[in-house]
Each structure stands twice: as C-alpha cells, then as structure tokens.
Regions:
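Membrane-embedded helix-loop-helix hairpins and adjacent transmembrane boundary segments
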Residues: 1-229
Length: 229
C-alpha cells in the first residue's frame, strides 16, 4: 500500500496505455484498409489542407511544425505546467522517495515517456480525424472527443473500448498519486503538526484513510459539476 502501491500502479497502467497507443499507430500507419497507410494519410491530409486550410499554419497545412496556434499552445502548456511540477505534492513525494542518484534520470525518463503519449496521439488519432473527415462538432472537439471519435471511425466499437481503457488507466494512475499526496499533507503536515503531535500510528492511518475517502468523493463530485456546466 501507500506510495509503493502508486509506483506499481503507475508502471502497470503506463504499460497498458503504451500498448493501446501502439495499437492505434499500427491501425493508422500499418493496416492500410481504411487510412491507406503512411502514403494514404499523407495524400488525405494534403487534400484536406487544400479544402480547409488551417489559419496560422504554414501554407495552411496540417503536416507542418510552423504553426502559430501550436506555438501559443506550447508556451501556455509549458508555463502552466511549471505549477503542476513544482507545487504538486505527488512529484515531491517521488523525488524524496527515490535515490538521489536516480532522481534526475527518473524524471527525465518520465518526461520522455509522458511526451510520447500526447505526441503519438496527435500524430495518429488527431490526424486520422482530419484524414477520414470524422463528423464531429467544434463543441465536441473542445470537450476532447476527437480521439474517441477517430478511434471509433477507425476500429469501430473496439476503438472506443481501447480509448476508454486508456482513459481509465490514466485517470486511476493520476488519481491514486493525488490521493496519497493529499492524505500525506493532511495527516503529517496538518493533523500531526497542529492537531495531535503525539498521534499514534493507528490514529495517523485512520486520518489518512478518512482523507483519501473524503478527497476521492470530492474529486468525483467536482468532476460531475464540471461536466454539467
């Protein structure tokens, strides 16, 4: 249990996510029945750019790194994620628990592993949605439904199941880390420091478990509220 359990869960869930992503890559660029493989995708994306060019992209193309919108998103993402890394207790717990000789290597490798997920999904499912002209509204796209829509168009019901599995793995992995992070702050930094300095091990465990339940319900309730807005 505890932090060790989150490490194991993160590792296993990441494996499942990567296997799912590799399945999508194979379906898009290897199996040529629907997309036409690499050449078919290229032709479809060039044709799509001629029909509806992207404002801010070089020549309005989809296959370009020269994108004003992409640059703006990158700046916002990098600046915004500084807060995620330096303020999130989950990162600090991992840094403190790891050996000093392994911390830098671990975080660099973790960053590369994370980068592979959005980059590969964008270059497979994102481009597939454009190439196959998936019927999706702007509102649905802003809600993050491009990937499931593209997966369904590409692989049918199996694609939707794979996306759901991948999403479940990501949410539970991140959720378990945050539960442990919040419970440790409440238990040791607040309860034992200010409320009960002489708390026994059983009392600390009780507070930790109560915090996990309360924070878990709070996250679920907040998710429902945000979905209904």
């Amino acid at each position: 249990g505890g932090l060790k359990a989150t490490f194991v869960a993160d590792y296993m869930h990441t494996i499942i996510i990567f296997v799912t992503i590799l399945t999508f890559v194979t379906a898009v660029y290897v199996n040529t029945d629907i997309t036409g493989g690499i050449e078919g995708m290229y032709d479809k994306l060039v044709q799509a750019a001629e029909i509806r060019p992207i404002e801010g992209n070089a020549a309005g193309a989809f296959l370009t790194m020269a994108s004003a919108g992409g640059l703006m998103f990158g700046i916002i993402n990098i600046v915004g994620n500084f807060g995620t890394v330096f303020v999130d207790q989950a990162y600090w717990q991992r840094a403190i628990a790891a050996k000093p000789s392994s911390t830098v290597k671990g975080f660099l490798l973790g960053g590369l592993c994370w980068f592979a997920i959005p980059f590969t999904l964008a270059t497979t499912m994102g481009l597939t949605a454009v190439a196959l002209d998936v019927d999706i509204t702007m509102q649905q796209a802003q809600m993050g439904l491009v990937v499931p829509a593209a997966a369904t168009a590409l692989m049918g019901e199996l694609g939707a199941i794979l996306v759901l599995t991948m999403l479940f793995m990501a949410v539970t992995s991140a959720g378990s880390a945050e539960l442990i992070a919040v419970s440790s702050i409440v238990t040791y930094d607040l309860y034992r420091t200010y409320k009960n300095p002489n708390a026994s091990g059983k009392q600390l465990v009780k507070v930790s478990r109560a915090t996990i339940v309360a924070f878990g319900l709070g996250m679920g309730g907040l998710a429902v509220v945000l979905l209904s807005m």
